[in-house]
């Protein structure tokens, strides 16, 4: 990386490291693996910085690479069912009250059990607040596929919640 890129690279790391780590953590459920993925993503950013056209493009690029690396890691290591809140110090997108919520922790446990395409779509939709069109662009998938994955993922998550979270339902 040329010296001219150093301040820009450092700014991008400062602005987006929480988001990158959080996405990797939600996708893998493994803190160590999420840290590895985040490091790999920023090393790739270092090599690709000259191709980044704007701040919006950088954010899009980081999300896409993080999701891709997380998916690859999940396929390699076949990580399953881990409490995502354990030892998580700085969580992007949720307040402290939500992080400590037993219901939130249980939902995270259920989320990690979803098939990867559905989990990826739901994480990008509800953690990153992306539109289905933005999710399709990030994942490189057709819009119809993304909408289907969101619908199937929500349906499956609701079914799992109805079975596993009865203590949180009134009158149950």
Predicted regions mapped to residue ranges:
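A short pre-motif secondary-structure segment
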Residues: 121-125
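A short, charge-rich alpha-helical start-of-domain segment used by transcription regulators
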Residues: 1-22, 32-35, 46
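Internal acidic/polar
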Residues: 80-104, 109, 131, 170-171
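Sigma70-family region 2
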Residues: 2-3, 39-57, 76-78, 160
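Structural recognition of an alpha-helix C-terminal capping motif at a helix-to-coil junction
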Residues: 22, 36-43, 56-68
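C-terminal edge and immediately downstream basic/flexible tail or linker adjoining helix-turn-helix-like DNA-binding
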Residues: 2-9, 101, 137-138, 155-172
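Arg/Lys-rich amphipathic alpha helix in sigma70-family domain 2
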Residues: 53, 64-85, 100
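DNA-recognition helix of helix-turn-helix
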Residues: 67, 71, 139-165
